[in-house]
């Protein structure tokens, strides 16, 4: 009885609510375009397929409940992922029906290439790459490194040879004179790639006669240079120009302070005398 009375009292309220719902639904249908409907359908289809293939907790790393063989799949290992999906190459995009599989093609093969898990160091030995190689191949080798000197060097300060091993000299005089004489008496292998000067060893290797000849040639060249006054500071360099003669017209000229004092050993090549 009470319900009938309330319905009889407010008949217009229900009518207004019904009209409002119809108006809003009509506005919503008109506002939808074909592009929006297509995007909505594609998103719904994608979520449905992902929900069908993926279980709850698939992306949760620390979830102990999702400890099944198909839940904790390494996303990097493509071959393992295909094996866990019963041989399928693309479990995410697979559909239950044949028409769905035809309408949703799998990803390209290049994106699913399985790389080898083997790794190691890579060495490059010269060359010009894939182009024509005009230079000889050079491979660095550590077999030619210089050996230790004979006798060996003194031990560093604080070095314990009994516990740390080695072949250095423990008892020695730690002075500059001893170090200079000791290094001069050592027989060391000289390496041109790791040492500054190997001239003494090269001259000793070529033989005594050729070593004396090289030293004689060097002395002759030095003597010729001294006779030609190449080391004379006061000598004029080639293309130095004529000596400057005093000019009476420059007596009243403004003196440049930067030209006073000692002249630096710098001369402008083919420079002209300019007066302002």
Swiss-Prot record:
Any one annotated GO CC term: extracellular region
Disulfide bridge positions per record: 155-168
GO molecular-function term, one example from the UniProt record: enzyme regulator activity
Principal subcellular localisation of the protein: secreted
Organism domain of life: Eukaryota
Compartment list: Secreted
Subunit structure, interactors included: Interacts with amon/PC2 early in the secretory pathway. Dissociation occurs at later stages.
Function: Acts as a molecular chaperone for neuroendocrine convertase amon/PC2, preventing its premature activation in the regulated secretory pathway. Binds to inactive amon in the endoplasmic reticulum and facilitates its transport from there to later compartments of the secretory pathway where it is proteolytically matured and activated. Also required for cleavage of amon.
Family, as annotated: Belongs to the 7B2 family.
Protein name: Neuroendocrine protein 7B2
Source organism per UniProt: Drosophila melanogaster
Gene: 7B2
């Amino acid at each position: 009885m009470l319900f009938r009375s309330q319905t009889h009292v407010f008949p217009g309220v229900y009518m207004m609510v019904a009209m409002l719902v119809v108006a809003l639904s009509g506005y919503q249908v008109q506002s939808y375009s074909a592009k929006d409907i297509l995007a909505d359908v594609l998103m719904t289809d994608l979520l449905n397929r992902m929900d069908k293939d993926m279980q709850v907790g698939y992306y949760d790393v620390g979830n102990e409940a999702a400890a099944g063989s198909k839940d904790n799949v390494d996303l990097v290992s493509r071959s393992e992922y295909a094996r866990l999906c019963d041989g399928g190459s693309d479990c995410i995009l697979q559909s239950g029906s044949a028409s769905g599989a035809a309408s949703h093609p799998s990803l390209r093969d290049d994106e699913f290439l399985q790389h080898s898990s083997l790794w190691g160091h890579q060495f490059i030995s010269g060359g010009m790459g894939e182009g024509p190689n005009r230079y000889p191949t050079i491979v660095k080798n550590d077999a030619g490194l210089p050996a230790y000197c004979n006798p060996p060097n003194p031990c560093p300060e604080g070095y314990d040879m009994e516990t740390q091993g080695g072949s250095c000299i423990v008892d020695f005089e730690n002075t500059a004179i001893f170090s200079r004489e000791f290094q001069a008496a050592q027989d060391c292998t000289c390496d041109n790639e790791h040492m500054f000067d190997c001239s003494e060893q090269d001259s000793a290797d070529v033989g005594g006669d050729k070593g004396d000849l090289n030293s004689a040639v060097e002395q002759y060249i030095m003597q010729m240079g001294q006779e030609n006054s190449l080391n004379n500071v006061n000598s004029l360099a080639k293309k130095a120009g004529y000596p400057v003669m005093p000019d009476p017209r420059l007596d009243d000229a403004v003196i440049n302070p930067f030209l006073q004092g000692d002249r630096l050993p710098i001369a402008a090549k083919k420079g002209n005398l300019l007066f302002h």
